Amino acid sequence: MKDPKVINGGVAIDARGSVTFVNDFDFSGVKRFYQVQNHRRGFIRAWHGHKKEAKYVYVPSGSALVGAIPMPEYVYMDEIGGDVEIIPGDKRPEKFVLSSKSPKVLYIPENYANGFMTLEENTIVQFFSTSTLEESLGDDMRFDFDKWNIWKEDFR
């Protein structure tokens, strides 16, 4: 897969309780996972990307706004005297709202940067990675949280 993709899930409820599931999610290729919980609503963790690592994102509690964008390519231009950033296809970040009330897994492909903002208190975001920690640390790029500023409130 070359673009972000949402894998939908569901909730089954009966007299015994509920079961939350994403049955079409395949763990093949996942090497590790980690879980993030911010200390407050509206906290932003962004932007972070990898050339070789893909991720799957799941929110088991609360909700989060997740952004994904192709990684910039850098070209050194001697006549300008610095690096020039080129975004493939001049893309804007794609935005996804993940919520425990509507279970789904978001696939973020390799060569993408991602970030998220918690929309509720006590939100938990789980990341499933296709790289080991050692592989990930050698393939890590970070960008300022407001580089692709998608974090504004959307009052409709």
Residue ranges and their predicted role:
Residues 1-101, 121-156:
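Non-catalytic, conserved peripheral segments adjacent to functional cores
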Residues 98-121:
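Conserved metal-binding segment of the jelly-roll/cupin
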